From Swiss-Prot:
Its main location: cytoplasm. It catalyses: S-sulfanyl-L-cysteinyl-[protein] + uridine(34) in tRNA + AH2 + ATP = 2-thiouridine(34) in tRNA + L-cysteinyl-[protein] + A + AMP + diphosphate + H(+). This is tRNA-specific 2-thiouridylase MnmA. One of its GO terms (cellular component) is cytoplasm. HAMAP family: tRNA_thiouridyl_MnmA. ATP binds at residues 26-33, 52, 144. InterPro entries: MnmA-like, MnmA-like_C, MnmA-like_central, MnmA-like_central_sf, Rossmann-like_a/b/a_fold. Keywords: ATP-binding, Cytoplasm, Disulfide bond, Nucleotide-binding, RNA-binding, Transferase, tRNA processing, tRNA-binding. Disulfide bonds join 120-217.
Length: 381
């Protein structure tokens, strides 16, 4: 029997007033997280802004559009001053290097195409920062990600953003149920980024017209190879460009300069047929090229699976879901066959081109917006 004086639930799901609810907001210095902080402060919540200094490296520090570079820390602090809540900067450079940058470099050296933004969310923002938020006695942590947290029959669920063009679910598949219980995503229901900027203007935020961040924060101008060479001197060892039929077509200056599916910039012009990178043989220092049809893949082994379904992953022999194998591609119908709690074979109904080890394979409800988790692609067949 409910008591007459039972406290109403606030907008973040807590049975107490906003003033009694402490929220740590992860602030990158961009418009999205700034709007989240301003919105929650305006609603009367006890907001604490936290910005992570992740990377401080020459051009990357001053690079326009690099997440949590020097200018972004300044912008986050300024928003906190404008809206009247405390703001802290935490030095996470060593954690970020160990958990994200080193693996990024090693993955490229192994011939993979990594997605460091997922690892950053998984190992830094939603792990260490979340624990810091709890140390600050926060009730929850809010971010500016475009994704939705909805309450289901068995607890909180992860759902795609209302705006499909801004949806960041691919990059957040590794969010665990325990983390999801503590996280909040106030922007996930908005119809567009324009709505976010309108809110920023209404709050008078200095970042209202700030451009969106681009590329990977520690990779100035998208030049992956130069960053890897700095991190791993001697990584760019020359080798041969070889056709899948065995013909040697030319030389290259390092496997790190190539990715699966690449067509341009191969340095083997003058051929009658268009050729694509179909395999990177790191041991032999070879870049294997072939016709486009060689990129087509239907079977995708996946490991390090984070499962967000209600029933155990291995409770079924098959799961009929949709999957994304690249962030920019639409979900494809697939059958997921569990091998263990953290490993599976994914069979696509139709072949997909350019699937690369190191990318994520994210599981979606084929008839709705729910995300069922995902894992990491480690090879294609």
């Amino acid at each position: 029997m409910a008591l007459d004086n039972e406290a109403p639930v606030n907008s973040l799901g807590f049975a107490k007033s906003p003033a009694e609810t402490r929220v740590v907001v992860a602030m990158s210095g961009g418009v999205d997280s700034s709007v989240v902080a301003a919105y929650l402060a305006d609603q009367g919540y006890d907001v604490v802004g936290v910005t992570l200094q992740l990377y401080d490296h020459g051009a990357a520090l001053a690079k326009k559009g690099a997440c949590c570079a020097g200018i972004d820390i300044h912008d986050a602090r300024r928003v906190a001053e404008e809206r009247g809540f405390p703001h802290y900067v935490l030095d996470y450079e060593n954690i970020f290097k160990d958990a994200v940058i080193d693996e990024f470099a090693d993955s490229y050296l192994a011939g993979a195409t990594p997605v460091p933004c997922i690892r950053c969310n998984e190992r830094v923002k939603f792990k260490d920062l979340l624990e810091t938020a709890k140390d600050l006695e926060a009730d929850c942590m809010a971010t500016g990600h475009y994704i939705q947290r909805k309450m289901g029959e068995h607890g909180p669920e992860l759902h795609s953003a209302e705006d499909a063009n801004r949806d960041q679910s691919y990059f957040l598949f590794s969010t665990t149920p325990e983390q999801l219980d503590f996280l909040r995503f106030p922007l996930g229901h908005l119809p567009s980024k324009d709505a976010t900027r309108e809110m920023a203007a209404q709050y008078g935020l200095s970042v209202a017209d700030k451009p969106d961040s681009q590329d990977i924060c520690f990779v100035p101008n998208g030049d992956y190879a130069s960053v890897i060479q700095k991190l791993r001197p001697g990584a760019a060892e020359p080798g041969q460009i070889v056709h899948a039929d065995g013909r040697v077509l030319g030389e290259h200056n390092g496997v790190i300069h190539y990715t699966i599916g690449q067509r341009r910039g191969l340095g083997i012009g003058g051929l009658s047929e268009p050729l694509y990178v179909v395999k990177l043989d790191v041991d032999q220092k070879q870049v294997i090229v072939g016709p486009k049809e060689m990129l087509a893949t239907r079977r995708v082994p996946v490991r390090e699976i984070n499962w967000l379904g209600d029933a155990p992953f291995t409770s079924r022999d098959e799961w009929h879901l949709s999957v994304k194998v690249r962030s920019t591609r639409p979900p494809r119908d697939a059958i997921i066959r569990p091998i263990s709690e953290t490993e599976a074979e994914v069979e696509l109904f139709s072949a997909e081109e350019g699937i690369s080890p190191g990318q994520a394979c994210v599981f979606y409800d084929p008839n709705g917006s729910r995300i069922y988790g995902g894992g990491w692609i480690w090879k294609g067949q």
